[in-house]
Amino acid sequence: MNAPFEKDRRNRRVAVVVVAAGRGERAGQAQNGPKQYRLIGGKPVIRHTLEVLAKSKRVGTIAVAVHPEDSSLFNQAREGLDGDIRAVHGGASRQESTRLALAALEEVKPDIVLIHDGVRPFIDEALIERVIEAVGEDSGALPALPVSDTLKRSGVNGIITGTVPRDGLFAAQTPQGFPFRPIYEAHQKAWQSGRSDFTDDAAIAEWAGISVRLVSGSPDNVKLTWAKDIALADQRLGPAMTELPDIRVGNGYDVHGFGPGGHVTLCGVQIPHGKTLMGHSDADVGLHALTDALLATCGAGDIGTHFPPSDPQWKGAKSRIFVEHAVNLLRARGGRIANADVTLICEAPRIGPYREAMLAELSDMLQISPERVSVKATTNEGLGFIGRAEGIAAIATATVAYPGSLGN
């Protein structure tokens, strides 16, 4: 037995591989996207999984195997989470994705690695602890539950050919834990041998001669495989949003002065005018104020934090980009926009003829119904720089509901 490995079990370095590169065909991926990014309880499935792992005091680096086409979805889902969470491009199979994520952890040199399905969001700290404590120098551990259903063997045309005894049968779960070096080498050996038919990491360990110990699993630790699984998970988490919703209101303000030009852009609509607004991007004061209001609801700073005026890539950019970025951030946190209100303050141009077009633009950007959006206009009664027609100001308010209660 390796003494350093065992002498202080509480100080062993633990890393996690989260496998989340699948396409989710069985859960209706074609219509609704990969299941790990489907919303349950107002947040992506993978977000729930990562929140539990990131909060664990035993877990260090988390390497998440992500499909290359899902990088943006993953970044939105993990936004705001603390800890060393790394995205790794996955492969064509679960086994290949796991091997690539393990390779990414080589530089971390963990003592133990937990390998977990990204679509098992209902893990808990106690389960993580049981698996870690059961891992030895040269042996792994996996959570499992005794098989309780009667098992039948089927033959041709679905005719039962026998009943399988349940004695000694267990349904495996994740996270499955292993000493890092042995399981990584086992994955490498399987890859080099052309073996890609293993259904979990414990099977690879067994094939490589690594013993694996069973620990008590959790009935709650279900894998979301089918569309109905996701619907049931959403129902399970739904009350957190409906019983004591966390309602947040954010405000935003922006102002830009006029310069030479022939039009202004307000709330995404181009309006003919004898001057243009000068400033960041297309200087859409309405959308800039709205972006700040949305960011305020999730404590994500302001527009300048995400899109610095000094960065030349945003020169002349459409401000719609900023609003959609803020919407993605709050939705990654489970936010649902209830209302957005923009007040434009100017002597000219007239806003009334363009109000309906503005409402349609905002509704599309925010992905909410037009009834939840408001655009108003007022003058400054001839007072100040606005009254002198030197510029336009905007005030915006956003109301967003987040999962959980005010106590969270």
Swiss-Prot record:
The enzyme's E.C. designation: 2.7.7.60, 4.6.1.12
Swiss-Prot/TrEMBL catalytic activity: 2-C-methyl-D-erythritol 4-phosphate + CTP + H(+) = 4-CDP-2-C-methyl-D-erythritol + diphosphate; 4-CDP-2-C-methyl-D-erythritol 2-phosphate = 2-C-methyl-D-erythritol 2,4-cyclic diphosphate + CMP
Cofactor(s) the protein needs: a divalent metal cation
InterPro entries, per database record: IspD, IspD/F, IspD/TarI, ISPD_synthase_CS, MECDP_synthase, MECDP_synthase_CS, MECDP_synthase_sf, Nucleotide-diphossugar_trans
Pathway: Isoprenoid biosynthesis; isopentenyl diphosphate biosynthesis via DXP pathway; isopentenyl diphosphate from 1-deoxy-D-xylulose 5-phosphate: step 2/6; Isoprenoid biosynthesis; isopentenyl diphosphate biosynthesis via DXP pathway; isopentenyl diphosphate from 1-deoxy-D-xylulose 5-phosphate: step 4/6
Entry similarity comment: In the N-terminal section; belongs to the IspD/TarI cytidylyltransferase family. IspD subfamily. In the C-terminal section; belongs to the IspF family.
Protein name, entry field: Bifunctional enzyme IspD/IspF
Gene expressing this chain: ispDF
